[in-house]
């Protein structure tokens, strides 16, 4: 493989001049079978770097730092992604550290609470700027361990207004969380009505995300056989990696998102670590570490379709997508391709009722063949091509505002992993068409030799256990029948200090739970919390599971055989 140094082509590594354009041009000129070397230094990317149509290409850092642009106070449209990778094959990024040129959030501690006026004061750590122009997209509080505790948790509606700044120039101010600067690194914040300020204590840790969604360090579409190895992300504006259709076979080795030692930041990324929307083949993650994320460490799913109309005689099916307000939207043009098998599920039960093969797909219209079963408008659709197999091995997730791993696929093995301090379940296996329109149901899942500690600890109807298998992401589970999921095995896992029971499984046909250990797994004030709940399940086996509560029912069965 030919080796080329970026320094030989005028790419600067002083962290000052933007190298995005020059780097993009160099990459476009590279032949196949090339290793592009980034010698030690900082490479400033103020615009996305395109990597289009390349084969057998490796990007190797040699002590290199990738620094993308982020401003806590300017228009977010000027913030930057890192690399946009499209239609590539056999690609590798390895041995890089990544950060931003500005902080992605700020953090501090509560110094005063005014219940009558619904305000609270926060002393922001001196390492963060406090000018009054910083835009707070959302608020999160954390306990002493840095685990998001939802005492205050907001996603804020952003307003824009044109004001005059201290130089006399006009400037757009973005406001989500309303606050006032009342002293040196001291702010007064008005709390929304839904927040119970009586739970907020002096010294409570608070962070404000300057943005939540919108920027990705590594973005992929139409790529095959990609590896990201030994990547250390210290600051990421939104997501570390996003994988969009139609991608196939991704490996993450030592892909880490965490703040550097000594940092006052509570989040290293404002949203997901890795977000996957339609992957074929396999996903492999080994020795990855995530600490302090604004959302899930991993969410793998595909876009749910819905049948709007069907003409069986002509073999024509019109398919749509629904947004969070349940409004009809067009499906992605990459949602299906010729030869794909589409699974059809009944909307209210999520039980599979048929399938068809795509002969042609355009603008949501499918010309279908091999139609099996009876379809109707409202039925849910999942493309079987996007049920990538998943292998997570020796991965660790700590202190995420949501789940550790949200898994919506088939043939999954999760082993030797550790999850700590997730507000919601450490692992959730579930599709969702109540809010998110994500699929799909799982089959053939093994979770073994993992440790779950301090998961699902906030008061929420979504916190049913450290490992949850059901049919919607948030509240609600008991009205889905057995058979949504199939063949789940959990063995030799340890559950400690869980804010609910350890395991909650619903709507599953084929459950085997062996040798799982439970210590201090109970809801606050409910010492008889069952350690395992099996709801609407069939063909279940539970043996040699052990709890520290001898007087507590270890397994609770609800409509389960």
Spell out what each predicted region is:
Residues 1-7, 12-19:
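Mature N-terminal, pre-catalytic/accessory segment of carbohydrate-active enzymes
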Residues 29, 47, 67-234, 259-267, ...:
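Extracellular polysaccharide-degrading/modifying enzymes targeting complex plant/algal/animal polysaccharides
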Residues 46-48, 68-73, 102-106, 215-216, ...:
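Short glycine/acidic-rich loop motifs that flank beta-strands on beta-rich extracellular proteins
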Residues 442-468, 472, 479:
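Eukaryotic tandem repeat interaction scaffolds
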């Amino acid at each position: 493989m030919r080796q080329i140094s970026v320094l030989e082509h005028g790419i600067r590594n002083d962290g000052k001049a933007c190298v995005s354009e020059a780097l993009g041009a160099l990459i476009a000129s590279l032949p196949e079978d090339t290793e592009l070397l980034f010698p030690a230094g900082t490479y400033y990317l103020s615009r996305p770097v395109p990597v289009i149509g390349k084969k057998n290409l490796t990007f190797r850092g040699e002590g290199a730092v990738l620094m993308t642009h982020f401003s806590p106070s300017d228009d977010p449209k000027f913030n930057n992604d890192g690399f946009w990778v499209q239609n590539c094959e056999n690609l590798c990024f390895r041995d890089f550290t990544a950060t931003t040129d500005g902080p992605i959030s700020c953090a501090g501690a509560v110094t005063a609470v005014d219940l009558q006026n619904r305000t609270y004061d926060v002393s922001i750590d001196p390492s963060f700027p406090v000018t009054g122009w910083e835009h707070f997209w959302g608020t999160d509080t954390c306990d002493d361990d840095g685990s998001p505790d939802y005492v205050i948790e907001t996603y804020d509606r952003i307003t824009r207004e044109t004001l005059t700044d201290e130089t006399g120039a006009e400037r757009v101010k973005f406001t989500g969380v309303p606050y006032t600067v009342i002293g040196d690194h001291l702010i007064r914040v008005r709390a929304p009505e839904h927040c119970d300020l009586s739970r907020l204590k002096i010294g409570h840790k608070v962070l404000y995300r300057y943005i939540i969604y919108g920027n990705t360090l590594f973005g992929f579409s139409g790529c095959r056989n990609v590896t990201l190895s030994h990547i250390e992300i210290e600051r990421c504006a939104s997501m570390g990696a996003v994988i969009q259709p139609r991608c196939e076979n991704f490996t993450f080795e030592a892909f880490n998102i965490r703040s550097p030692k000594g940092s006052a930041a509570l989040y290293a990324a404002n949203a997901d670590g890795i977000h996957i929307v339609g992957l074929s083949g396999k996903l492999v993650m080994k020795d990855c570490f995530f600490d302090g994320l604004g959302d899930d460490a991993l969410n793998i799913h595909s876009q749910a379709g819905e049948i709007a109309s069907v003409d069986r005689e002509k073999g024509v099916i019109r398919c749509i997508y629904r947004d969070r307000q349940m409004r009809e939207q067009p499906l992605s043009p990459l949602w299906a391709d010729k030869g794909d098998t589409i699974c059809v599920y009944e909307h209210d039960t999520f039980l599979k009722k048929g399938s068809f093969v795509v002969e042609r797909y355009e603008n949501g219209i499918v010309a279908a063949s091999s139609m099996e079963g009876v379809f109707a408008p409202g039925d849910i659709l999942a493309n079987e091509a996007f049920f990538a197999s998943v292998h997570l091995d020796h991965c660790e997730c700590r202190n995420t505002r949501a789940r550790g791993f949200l898994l919506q696929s088939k043939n999954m093995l999760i082993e030797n992993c550790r999850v700590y301090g997730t507000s919601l379940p450490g692992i959730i296996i579930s599709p969702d068409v109540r809010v998110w329109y994500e699929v799909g149901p799982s089959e053939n899942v093994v979770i073994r030799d993992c440790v779950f500690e301090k998961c699902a600890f906030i008061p929420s109807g979504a916190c049913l256990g450290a490992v949850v298998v059901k049919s919607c992401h948030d509240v609600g589970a008991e009205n889905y029948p057995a058979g949504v999921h199939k063949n789940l095995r959990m063995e030799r896992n340890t559950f400690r200090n869980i804010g609910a029971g350890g395991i909650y499984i619903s709507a599953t046909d084929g459950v085997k739970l062996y040798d799982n250990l439970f210590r201090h797994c109970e809801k606050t004030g409910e010492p008889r919390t069952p350690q395992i709940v099996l709801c609407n399940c069939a063909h279940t086996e539970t043996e040699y599971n052990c709890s520290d509560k001898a007087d507590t029912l270890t397994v609770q069965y609800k409509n389960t055989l």
